Amino acid sequence: MEKVDIFKDIAERTGGDIYLGVVGAVRTGKSTFIKKFMELVVLPNISNEADRARAQDELPQSAAGKTIMTTEPKFVPNQAMSVHVSDGLDVNIRLVDCVGYTVPGAKGYEDENGPRMINTPWYEEPIPFHEAAEIGTRKVIQEHSTIGVVITTDGTIGDIARSDYIEAEERVIEELKEVGKPFIMVINSVRPYHPETEAMRQDLSEKYDIPVLAMSVESMRESDVLSVLREALYEFPVLEVNVNLPSWVMVLKENHWLRESYQESVKETVKDIKRLRDVDRVVGQFSEFEFIESAGLAGIELGQGVAEIDLYAPDHLYDQILKEVVGVEIRGRDHLLELMQDFAHAKTEYDQVSDALKMVKQTGYGIAAPALADMSLDEPEIIRQGSRFGVRLKAVAPSIHMIKVDVESEFAPIIGTEKQSEELVRYLMQDFEDDPLSIWNSDIFGRSLSSIVREGIQAKLSLMPENARYKLKETLERIINEGSGGLIAIIL
């Protein structure tokens, strides 16, 4: 990631204000980190000579040894400085140097009268050194910073052992996690690439679940500063996660089992994403679902906090769903093409009557208007009205009329006594409440109730004579073509 991109993305997430709160134990190199940060990326980008000189004068002092150098919180520079990164990109940068948490072996937080009292921007009266460290850390991160940087050490930069830093380090991390701002940790070491330092870096990263970088703060380069900002950027919260399902899954109905399974997997997995850093880990979890072959990170907008994930389904699942939807097993491309031709023909026929079907279900009567292809035009005929002539054009088109008729079917077996009849009713109704459709599968005299009822309905439908059907059709034609609304029916 380029330098400009890093600053641009962080500026978007912080509203253009890059305020780094540098916290940690005493004698870890916090002031040195701030000084190098300013010298490498801030001072060279300040165009105004006077502002650059003022910022240079405000750099903190640092020195080796056990004596504490920073005895009060300090803003560097005192007022946020506008830094020109590139065309159209100006950011406000300020760092805050905190009073560190005390550690055994450090000198300067006590004097001959006991705990050293220091001045802070938050209280009018001086407060003890250790209290200023606790209050300052929380206030700096919560009120004066957009990003937190914890500086710790492996003990190689001075005369204080690594073990003396652990308690203060844990307290700082605990404070920062309570505040909830994005932060990272830097291990200040004179041997940042040593296997022991690398092992320590990995241990701390797992212990605190944060990114940890190892570097020599004293010899820090611009690339190291950008690495800190880049890692901090991935600690910002995710604002939106877009998950793209396979395109063919998206065309399934909302209540289809596979689409619901995909949606449930997304809900279950995405809920673990809190930070931008979590996205990569969560992408791998999608592969645990049997209906997801793989998942990939399609893109991530660091400045917007938006991540996009693509999900891919196995090929055999497509074949399975196709068989389920079509109703037959697809034997090959030729078979699929044959089916598509049949379905296309069926759809064309259905489209002509679909509106009529909806109408007949709602009102009991439906009309399917004829298509242009169904219309036939008679030969034009010249007509005369008095002294004037005209042309008669006559077209004939078949319209389909649907009538919903409720057919009654009754089955009343005489089986014996009243008690036997009650037992039959009880047998028929035993599963009705749990599954109303189960009554049709009830066995009566060796046959299912559904087959008995269906047979009765079919018998009634076949009773309508041919001449009655013809007369009904003829009657409808006269009503429609002659516009007569009156109808008298005599059923014999």
Swiss-Prot record:
Changing I400P: Altered cortex and coat formation, affects localization to the forespore. Pfam families: SpoIVA_ATPase, SpoIVA_C, SpoIVA_middle. Changing K30E: Mislocalized to the mother cell cytosol. Misassembles the spore coat. Mislocalizes CotE but not SpoVM. Does not multimerize. Almost complete block in spore formation. GO terms for molecular function: ATP binding; ATP hydrolysis activity. It is found in: Cytoplasm. Changing T70A: 500-fold decrease in sporulation efficiency. 5-log decrease in sporulation efficiency; no ATPase activity, but no change in ATP-binding ability; unable to polymerize and fails to promote coat assembly. Changing V283N: Defective in germination. GO terms for biological process: peptidoglycan metabolic process; protein complex oligomerization; protein polymerization; spore germination; spore wall assembly; spore wall biogenesis; sporulation; sporulation resulting in formation of a cellular spore. Its EC number is 3.6.1.-. NCBIfam families: spore_IV_A (TIGR02836). Present in an increased level in yabG mutant spores. This is Stage IV sporulation protein A. It comes from Bacillus subtilis (strain 168).
